[in-house]
Swiss-Prot record:
Family membership: Belongs to the PetM family.
MF GO annotations: electron transfer activity
Name of the protein described by the UniProt record: Cytochrome b6-f complex subunit 7
Pfam families: PetM
GO CC annotation, single: plasma membrane-derived thylakoid membrane
Subunit structure as annotated in this protein's UniProt entry: The 4 large subunits of the cytochrome b6-f complex are cytochrome b6, subunit IV (17 kDa polypeptide, PetD), cytochrome f and the Rieske protein, while the 4 small subunits are PetG, PetL, PetM and PetN. The complex functions as a dimer.
GO BP of this protein: photosynthesis
Key word Cell membrane present: no
Gene field: petM
Function per UniProt: Component of the cytochrome b6-f complex, which mediates electron transfer between photosystem II (PSII) and photosystem I (PSI), cyclic electron flow around PSI, and state transitions.
UniProt xrefs under SUPFAM superfamilies: PetM subunit of the cytochrome b6f complex
């Protein structure tokens, strides 16, 4: 059971980092293109 908890926690952290990176990248592209 412990392994499942760590796996879920790891996946959630990775997905969160990926989401933040994508959002930041999109903002940079849109702002850079606008300027």
């Amino acid at each position: 059971m412990a392994s499942e908890i760590f796996t879920i926690a790891g996946l959630s952290i990775v997905l969160t980092l990926v989401g933040v990176a994508l959002g930041y990248g999109i903002l940079r592209i849109t702002q850079g293109g606008a300027e």
